[in-house]
């Protein structure tokens, strides 16, 4: 334990001093941005709260391990007519490599529009179903989710986020407890994602993009005769077309990026494995592609 004591007693105080002195931090690292300094402060707060065993390359907090940033360079000047649709994240229970995969697809397909299909956070602690009594506390799970989401936000600073059923769990609990919405903070304020727009659904190029709680995409295109892009169903990743004499519509399920080995996903251990992937739609909504992520 000596090396951990050294970190806490010798290194951590210096990091705190630097993070609390913006001028000094920017002198040490001239390119240091205020948001990066704030990010350092948050890391320190989490270390102080939960302790630290070692600093590793582990992409999420595992036990009491400090997370290494997975944020990637922002892809600039993408074509706004090309859409990247990112599957359910369920942070902090997201596959570490899923961020890199989605960022690669954005650049490969020159996507200037980014949409998260919903359930960006899991809120396992607040589930209406049984939650794991040995899992994270409410505060720790949220801290871990916020920290993980910060990597996604730094990589995709401008995005539209569809609100999923897991995202709204806390809002539902507050509502059923008689708490006025005036007391509830906005998603972007809780998650520190001021550049993201949170919406129930969005229409682009006459495509209905929604979380997917109303049935599968292939069924909805039959009943609504409108193209649909959805998430929610972790085991489905596909594009189906419905063609008539005067119309062509498609239904896309974009898969997900969940870590099936995490305790929060234990409810699905006896079902099909999740389809890890994302979707892109090119040429103003005319060319949908479902892209599986290579595993292993």
Question: Where are each of the predicted segments found?
Answer:
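Core catalytic region of metal-dependent phosphoesterases/phosphodiesterases
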Residues: 86-191
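Structural motif
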Residues: 81-83, 113-115, 207-208, 227-229
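Mobile, glycine- and charge-enriched loop segments
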Residues: 63-96, 108
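Conserved beta-sheet core of the metallophosphoesterase superfamily
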Residues: 205-293
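Short, basic interhelical loop/turn and adjoining N-cap
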Residues: 22, 26-46
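Short, solvent-exposed alpha-helical "recognition" segments
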Residues: 40-61
């Amino acid at each position: 334990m000596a090396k951990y004591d050294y970190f806490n007693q010798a290194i951590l105080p210096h990091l705190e001093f630097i993070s609390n002195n913006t001028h000094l931090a920017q002198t040490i690292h001239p390119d240091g941005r205020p948001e990066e300094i704030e990010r350092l402060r948050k890391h320190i707060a989490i270390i102080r709260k939960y302790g630290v065993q070692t600093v590793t390359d582990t992409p999420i907090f595992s036990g009491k391990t400090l997370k290494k940033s997975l944020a990637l360079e922002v892809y600039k000047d993408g074509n706004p007519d090309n859409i990247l649709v990112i599957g359910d994240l369920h942070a902090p229970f997201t596959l570490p490599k899923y961020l890199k995969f989605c960022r690669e697809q954005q650049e490969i397909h020159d996507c200037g529009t980014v949409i998260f299909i919903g359930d960006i956070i899991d809120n396992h602690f607040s589930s209406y179903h049984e939650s794991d009594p040995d899992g994270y506390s409410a505060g720790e799970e949220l801290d871990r989710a916020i920290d993980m989401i910060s990597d996604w936000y730094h990589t995709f600073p401008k995005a539209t986020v569809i609100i999923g059923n897991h995202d709204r769990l806390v809002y539902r609990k507050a509502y059923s407890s008689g708490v006025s919405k005036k007391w509830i903070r906005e998603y972007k304020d809780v998650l520190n994602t001021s550049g993201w727009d949170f919406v129930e659904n969005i229409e682009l190029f006459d495509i209905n993009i929604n979380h997917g709680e109303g049935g599968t995409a292939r069924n909805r295109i039959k009943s609504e005769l409108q193209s649909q892009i959805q998430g929610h169903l972790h085991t489905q990743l596909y594009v189906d077309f419905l063609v008539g004499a005067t119309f062509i519509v498609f239904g896309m399920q974009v898969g997900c990026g969940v870590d099936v080995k995490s305790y929060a996903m234990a409810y699905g251990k006896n079902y099909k494995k999740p389809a890890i992937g994302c979707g892109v739609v090119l040429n103003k909504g005319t060319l949908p592609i479902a892209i599986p992520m290579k595993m292993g």
